[in-house]
Design a protein with these regions (language model features):
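Symmetry-related core transmembrane helices of the 12-TM Major Facilitator Superfamily/SLC fold
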Residues: 117-136
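Residue-level signature of mid-helix packing/kink "hotspots" within the transmembrane helices
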Residues: 6-14, 64, 95-99
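Intracellular juxtamembrane helix-capping segments at the cytosolic ends
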Residues: 65-78
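Paired small-residue
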Residues: 39, 50-59
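Loop-to-transmembrane helix entry/capping segments in MFS-fold secondary transporters
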Residues: 80-90
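C-terminal ends and interior cores of transmembrane alpha-helices
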Residues: 34-47
């Protein structure tokens, strides 16, 4: 199951790059984060082996392209002299969040003996991510992209 998820995550990373070239990093991240949330929601309703493989595949198709979009967004929204530090901060926060999130969901499972609550925890954090990305998307549509300013 994990191998399937990771293999499709590779497809997601490459595909997200192509999509970002067409619609931008923020829009791509918004789509990927939303679809990752849908996949997390599906985990709540399926528990058979076959269905878990299918849901894991769906999850892999969307989660793999999320982290690379943080670097794309930093470069889209920031001047080159600030983008490097912002990318480092974004990736560090992502790594911390994944490490803490996995641990915290394990604690939730240990306390409740339920994967349902652990996946709900993931959905809450996904909603938080979607709120931030939605704000960036809305804000970015009102401003001229840095790339256009530099080209002028």
């Amino acid at each position: 199951m994990l191998s399937l998820m990771m293999a499709l995550g590779i497809v997601s990373r490459i595909g997200s790059g192509f999509i970002a070239d067409m619609i931008g990093g923020t829009a791509t991240l918004l789509i990927g984060s939303f679809m990752q949330g849908v996949a997390l929601l599906l985990y709540l309703y399926f528990n058979g082996l076959e269905s878990l493989f299918i849901v894991s595949g769906i999850f892999g198709l969307f989660q793999g392209g999320i982290v690379p979009m943080y670097a794309v967004i930093c470069r889209e929204l920031l001047p080159p002299r600030r983008a490097g530090a912002a990318i480092g901060l974004a990736v560090s926060a992502t790594i911390f969040g994944m490490a803490f999130g996995g641990y915290f969901s394990g604690v939730i499972f240990d306390l409740t003996s339920s994967y349902r609550m652990a996946f709900l925890n993931g959905l809450l954090w996904n909603a938080f991510n979607l709120a931030i990305v939605s704000w960036l998307f809305w804000r970015g549509r009102r401003r001229q992209p840095v790339g256009e300013l530099l080209a002028a």
